[in-house]
Amino acid sequence: EYAMPTQHGFARDMEFEPVLCDMDECWFKLKDTPETFAKYPFHFELEIGHRLEGRTITVMWKVTNQDSGEMLFMIGGHPAFQVPEGRSIYDFTFEFNRQGCREGQHQDSLHYLAPTPEGYESGELQGTLKLQEGRTPLTKGFFDTALTYMFDDAQVSSVSLLLDGRPYVTMGCNDFPYLGVWTMEETHPFVCLEP
């Protein structure tokens, strides 16, 4: 048996080697080591790239199995967006662009799942987030109902944080089966959008 010491894996705590860095694109690589093999028994190469095109940043992940057998893995990001100076988290409105609905679900609502105590997807439906024309304000107490809103079944194709009615940041999440939305509203001025 192998134990993962943290719910977020080991890669985030390791030093990546720069592979390519120019004006609009950077790539970094992490390869397995005896230290990683003790936690994760696979030979791998993980490359993470960031590309800037105009006002859009694209994040890319490439995982390569260096063995001949099957390699199990899970990957995800932890993007957090800081509230502009002089503003509050409560100045934001969420705008969800819908991709699909569960059976019996209204177009202006999203079903969210109850996360496990470790923060993983449980598969258990926790509730329904009501939307008005795809939007809901981030009000004080918004995260009292759910510390993390976790949407499944690729219900959301993109999510925007609106500030003064205009997109402050928009994240596409078409290719992801889950989207987590959370904040530590009382202590940290950021909002996390995690595909």
Q: Where on the chain are the PLM-derived regions?
A:
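Active-site/ligand-binding surface loops and adjacent short beta/alpha elements
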Residues: 70-72, 80-173
